[in-house]
Curated annotation (Swiss-Prot):
Summary of subunit composition and partner proteins: Homodimer.
Binding residue positions for (6R)-5,10-methylene-5,6,7,8-tetrahydrofolate: 51, 193, 286
Function: Catalyzes the reductive methylation of 2'-deoxyuridine-5'-monophosphate (dUMP) to 2'-deoxythymidine-5'-monophosphate (dTMP) while utilizing 5,10-methylenetetrahydrofolate (mTHF) as the methyl donor and reductant in the reaction, yielding dihydrofolate (DHF) as a by-product. This enzymatic reaction provides an intracellular de novo source of dTMP, an essential precursor for DNA biosynthesis.
Organism field: Mycoplasma pneumoniae (strain ATCC 29342 / M129 / Subtype 1) (Mycoplasmoides pneumoniae)
PANTHER family, A to Z: THYMIDYLATE SYNTHASE, THYMIDYLATE SYNTHASE 1
GO molecular function, a single term: thymidylate synthase activity
Pfam families for the chain: Thymidylat_synt (PF00303)
Name of the protein in its database record: Thymidylate synthase
Keyword terms: Cytoplasm, Methyltransferase, Nucleotide biosynthesis, Transferase
GO biological process: dTMP biosynthetic process; dTTP biosynthetic process; methylation
Entry EC number(s): 2.1.1.45
An annotated GO cellular component: cytosol
Amino acid sequence: MQQYLDLARYVLEHGKYRPNRTDTAGIGVFGYQMHFDISKHFPLLTTKKVHWKSIVHELLWFIKGDTNIKYLVDNKVNIWNEWPYESFKKSPHFNGESQKEFIERIRQDAKFAQQFGNLGPVYGKQWRDFNGVDQLKKVIAQIKVNPFSRRLIVSSWNPNEVDQMLLPPCHSLYQFYVQDGQLSCQLYQRSGDIFLGIPFNIASYSLLVYLVAKETNLKPGSFVHTIGDAHIYENHLEQIKLQLTRQPKPLPKVVLKSDKSIFDYQFDDIELVDYDHHPTIKGEVAV
């Protein structure tokens, strides 16, 4: 995807040093926007392998309103493990367990998972219960009856609850837009980790468009990605530079294999077709 490579190159060339809350500094810019046509192909990065299983399970987890990592852990999705583990280490119940041991106990012990696996009122909670409002269900209903509304918005940023979240929402607000039978979406992301996070976010919200479009008898249109603080961590610089040496491959397609409600979708109902990619590039997450 050339749009992603252009973003990475722009931040490498124009980014300024940015200290932050983590122990890993980086370079960043403020305010960047990408446009993706998702009507025929699916924007899953090809200059490295992106873990499709994690993207799908995380989105289904959001849609179900879940905020506990047990569902993810049970499905071998490890993208949220660090934050509950860091919280557990500060509790009086911590006895020197490694993160691997902590996650294994989450998998095996439902009571332990209920106590220590929760991230607080993060995305799923806000999408499905923002101070009592089921935003996702409400916006889908509005698309069906008033598709030209300018209020087709879901916010994950709840000032009343943000301090209770182990990680405040990076992708903070999204808006749907209907034109000529197509559904489009714009995401505002307050903070974007270009190497690890942004490829996931592009794919996740594009998949959300596919699911909501099917639910509302529309076709996928476009995805617009607006990033506030777009940054590359210093321990990802070489990985980004490696990606810039790779030629993007043709984009895959996504097939939705079920007519069930978006709220009942399962992993096997979603099929990724013809995903041709360059090899995996590893990088550590900044917690």
